[in-house]
């Protein structure tokens, strides 16, 4: 069973925390993580790119000059792809890029991503993160205490003052535990997570 240090938001160690093997100590499945990240990125694509082929460009129905005797290369239409304003070869058309992933694979991918952060000692567990008023410098101070630059902060309920304080810090993203996904966990170098968020993850994914 993995054990990590438990800190307060000032960066001081206040104890230890045992993590569930079934969530934070699984065998890392890189294939599942790759598939889920690929699906997440594909599902963000609009798929609205479009261009006209030579058949769809208006005009060009008449041969621009006679076949022989001009000294120029033979041409059949001014809308052929080699002409300016001609059609596009293999023109892109609107399409749906969406991919569906089984829930079981998403679950495996989340657990694999969390385990990889624990294994690499890139997960910091904090007993709680609270601010009386929005103060960006307080969050920066906390992150500096953990030597965290490009960081994902996961809280149990994304307290408004903490959210407002962290949202404008470059390279930092804060999300409630209900919104965690593989892409964000892997994208950021370090994960700072509250103790309550860890409990919630273990409750949902164990």
From Swiss-Prot:
Region (Disordered): 47-75
Top-rank taxon, per record: Bacteria
GO function terms (MF aspect): rRNA binding; structural constituent of ribosome
Any one GO biological process: translation
Keyword RNA-binding (UniProt): yes
GO cellular component: ribonucleoprotein complex; ribosome
HAMAP family: Ribosomal_uL4_B (MF_01328_B)
Quaternary structure, from the entry: Part of the 50S ribosomal subunit.
Family: Belongs to the universal ribosomal protein uL4 family.
Job of this protein: One of the primary rRNA binding proteins, this protein initially binds near the 5'-end of the 23S rRNA. It is important during the early stages of 50S assembly. It makes multiple contacts with different domains of the 23S rRNA in the assembled 50S subunit and ribosome.
Protein name per UniProt: Large ribosomal subunit protein uL4
Gene: rplD
């Amino acid at each position: 069973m993995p054990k990590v240090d438990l800190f307060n938001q000032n960066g001081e160690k206040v104890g230890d925390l045992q993590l569930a093997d079934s969530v934070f100590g699984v065998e890392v499945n890189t294939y599942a993580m790759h598939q889920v990240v690929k699906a997440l990125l594909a599902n963000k694509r609009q798929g609205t790119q479009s261009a006209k082929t030579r058949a769809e460009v208006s005009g060009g129905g008449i041969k621009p000059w006679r076949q022989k005797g001009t000294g120029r290369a033979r041409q059949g239409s001014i809308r052929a792809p080699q002409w300016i304003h001609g059609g596009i070869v293999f023109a892109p058309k609107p399409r749906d890029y969406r991919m569906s992933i089984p829930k079981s694979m998403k679950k495996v991918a989340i657990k694999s991503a969390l385990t990889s952060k624990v294994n690499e000692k890139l997960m910091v567990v904090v007993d709680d993160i609270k601010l009386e008023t929005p103060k960006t410098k307080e969050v920066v101070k906390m992150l500096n205490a953990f030597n965290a630059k490009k960081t994902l902060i996961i809280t149990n309920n994304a307290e408004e003052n903490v959210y407002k304080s962290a949202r404008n810090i470059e390279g930092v993203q804060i999300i409630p535990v209900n919104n965690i996904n593989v892409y964000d966990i892997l994208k950021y170098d370090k994960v700072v997570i509250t103790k309550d968020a860890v409990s919630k993850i273990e409750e949902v994914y164990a």
